[in-house]
Amino acid sequence: MISLQIVKIPIERTRVLRENTKQIEKNANVKLSIEEENVIIEGDPYNEWRAVDVIKAIGRGFPINSALKLLNDEYILKIINLKEIFPRENQRRRYLARIIGTRGKVKKKLEEITGAEICIYGNTVSVIGRLNEAALAERAINLIIKGLGHSSVYFIIQKEKMRMLE
């Protein structure tokens, strides 16, 4: 049974998608059509469902190699939209800056601790990782959004990671 899904991505990310269409089609076993910011995915429902996350990840700024990990059932995509949390732009900018850190240090440290990949694009913070990794990264981001200090967040996340490994 062939079905159809439509996913919207930012127009400026369609170039990256166009350059990698064949690779995605081959790996996900789907057919892609790109019309401005709309991406039409055709294939069997399961492959379509997996390809939707790959397209969303590319739309949220991830490189193709990171996005293709989502074809593996062990990996998930989490998207946190700061526009839904903070109505004012100056608030969003401040919290995005806290998540990124000076020269990307906070983001890099969170990726090291959790094992997940984090991408900031527009008003969103997105995470790709295995279930536990993505959940830890999402928790860390939410703690930063709640206003906890970076060192407290690192401590809490490292402790939770150790508990998961037991």
Q: Residues of each region from the PLM?
A:
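Predominantly single-stranded RNA-binding modules in RNA-associated proteins
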Residues: 1-166
